[in-house]
Amino acid sequence: MQVRQITSERHLAYIAGRNSVSFLQTPAWGKTKTGWSSQSLGWFEGEELIGAALILLRKVPKVEKYLAYLPEGPDLNWDSSKDVEMALSALVTFAKARGVFQLKMGPHTWVRRWHAQTLKDVIAQGTVKTIGEVTPDEINANGINLLKQLPALGWRQRKAEASGFGDFQPRYVFQIALTGKTEEQIFEGFNQQWRRNIRKAEKEGVTVRQGTITDLPTFHVC
């Protein structure tokens, strides 16, 4: 397995065939990162593209050394321990050849899930201080295996800090399932204060519409 740089067009074509890829792993995201350069990478078995990633690079002043970061990536088959080991070994080889002294990534996979009601209950009880203390409703066995495998391969999970290179993503993400629900059903899922705020905004003339790229200049003026 090898890692090679690919074009943005090929990267986007690969993403189009995937079920779910973070927007932080699209070529467009690299263009928004001030102070970073970016490349699209491809994982190949022979000439078959089997994985892809956006890698962000930040140069150290005065020397040809780089900090590399793959936000919520790379996009690989994280469920296969054998594939993970080969893919990450190929990534490290690629990075070292290009002067990378520190390589960070954020696999876009989940380990534990909590239902909204579960979190509401423990918040009301006031018995815990962090989400990690709450017994999860679901556990992803593949995610647990990945947490064990990565340290064995030499990777270390660091604590997110408020300052630094801005190279960490939130470890806990709240997601609202919209599929199969009406607007009213979604609205009923909000707490009372949120519903009041939404109604107040509507009365004051706040509207929501899908924008286009032509709206960006107006957005930045605001």
Protein language model regions, located:
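Acyltransferase donor/substrate-recognition loop-hinge adjacent to the catalytic core
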Residues: 1-4, 51, 139-222
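N-terminal charged segments
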Residues: 4-46, 52
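Residues that form or immediately flank small-molecule/cofactor binding pockets and catalytic motifs
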Residues: 8, 60, 213
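Short, solvent-exposed loop/turn elements at beta->coil junctions and helix N-caps
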Residues: 27-31, 58, 161-164
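Conserved donor-binding loop and adjoining core beta-sheet/short helix segment
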Residues: 31-135
